[in-house]
Structures are given as C-alpha cells and as structure tokens.
Amino acid sequence: MKYIKIYILRNKKFKNQNINFLKIKPFNCPNYNFFGNEIRRSLLLNIKKTMTITNIKFFISKSKSKHPKKLKIFHPVNEFFDIEEIKENLSNICINLKKLRFKFNPKNNKEKKTFIILNSFNKKSFSAKDIIIPSTSNLKIVNLKEHLFNKISQKINLKVLIKIENNENYFYNPIKRINFILEKNNNIGKYIILDLNSDININPFKAFIESLKYLNLNNT
C-alpha cells in the first residue's frame, strides 16, 4: 500500500485536550484491522515529548515583610511539609505542576535542561503564568492558565524551584486515547474511523501524520 486518503471529520480544541475524528481510506490494503493496529501502536510508541519536570524543590520564608527585596532567608522543605498559610498541601502543588505542558524551540536542541522559578509574593492565587522562565531559555509553557495553588495568608512566602529536562529517559506520551473502527460504504468500500484524543501540547492530526513515518506502508 502506497497511498492513503484522509478526511478530517471533527477537530475540536478544549481547555485540556484536543480531539480529532479521522476517516482513513488506505488503497490496496489487504488487512484493515492490521493497519489500524499498526497506526495505534506507532502513536503509542513513537509520539513522545521529552520536555518534562524531573525535580521540584520548595523553600519558605516566614518573614512578615511584604517587600520581596527584604526577603533573604529561605528554608528548604519537602513536599510532605504542612503549611497552614497555603490552601493546598505541597504534594498537591507537585501534582498541579506536573500537569504543565512545555514547548521547546526545535532549532535549539543543545539545551538539555533549564530551571524555572515560582515566587509567591503579594498575591493570593497562582497559576502557570506566574512562573519565571530565564530569558536565555527557549522553553515555553503551553497551558499558562493552569491553576497551581492559593495562599490564605501573606505571612509566609513560598519559592518553588522546578527542573525541566530534555532527556530521553524522561518522557511522556501526549496521546491520551486511540480508538478505531472499521466501516464499509458501498461507494468507497472499506475505511477506518480513527478517534484521537491528545493533551494540548500536540495536534492529534499532526501526531497521526508523524506516526505514519514509522510505518512501512509498502508492506501493509
């Protein structure tokens, strides 16, 4: 099989996910079920994102000053430390941070890691847009509206140091769901309906096209 005809039936973007329904008509395909499984396998194994959070460190200062410049002493705490002045516990903040999705400029593939910082000064609610990224880094946060935590009191300040790595040992698959069904039409014959669900860091249709590169279509 050398040619595939693709129809986009549905393309929806939501807050935390992207959904695509594709109609796929492979030409001269002897086994449609095998072809569908090969696409599913390629999407699960080959579509990876390697920019992930690999370490999170918390530091607190109990200074009563509201002026950030006067805060000099921060003490490290672990994620199981209970802070009354913060609504969420630190372990839940870790979970929220790991929901963040990152994009990296592909032109700069030499940067293997970077550190980003979140300072909780003079605000009550903090989201991904409050994270400070070094100006020298090409890293971008995709879901800037992702909520991280709320402060109940300004008596304490929390500093979060986050390590982001571009490493093959740390990766996740942005494809969340893959389903396919085989259908038959009297006019065009057999075809495959592919249901793709991904996080907001990737377009499902582009992921599908990328997955085809790993298939030997001539032998399918």
Swiss-Prot record:
Q: Which UniProt keywords apply?
A: DNA-directed RNA polymerase, Nucleotidyltransferase, Plastid, Transcription, Transferase
- Recorded superkingdom: Eukaryota
Q: What is its EC number?
A: 2.7.7.6
A single Gene Ontology CC annotation of this entry is: plastid
- Catalysis performed (reactions): RNA(n) + a ribonucleoside 5'-triphosphate = RNA(n+1) + diphosphate
Q: Which GO terms describe its molecular function?
A: DNA-directed RNA polymerase activity; protein dimerization activity
* Enzyme class (EC, first level): transferase
Q: Does the keyword S-adenosyl-L-methionine apply?
A: no
Annotated localization: Plastid
Biological processes annotated in GO: DNA-templated transcription
The subunit field of the Swiss-Prot or TrEMBL record says: In plastids the minimal PEP RNA polymerase catalytic core is composed of four subunits: alpha, beta, beta', and beta''. When a (nuclear-encoded) sigma factor is associated with the core the holoenzyme is formed, which can initiate transcription.
Outline what the protein does: DNA-dependent RNA polymerase catalyzes the transcription of DNA into RNA using the four ribonucleoside triphosphates as substrates.
Q: Which family does it belong to?
A: Belongs to the RNA polymerase alpha chain family.
Name assigned to this protein: DNA-directed RNA polymerase subunit alpha
Source species, please?
Euglena longa (Euglenophycean alga)
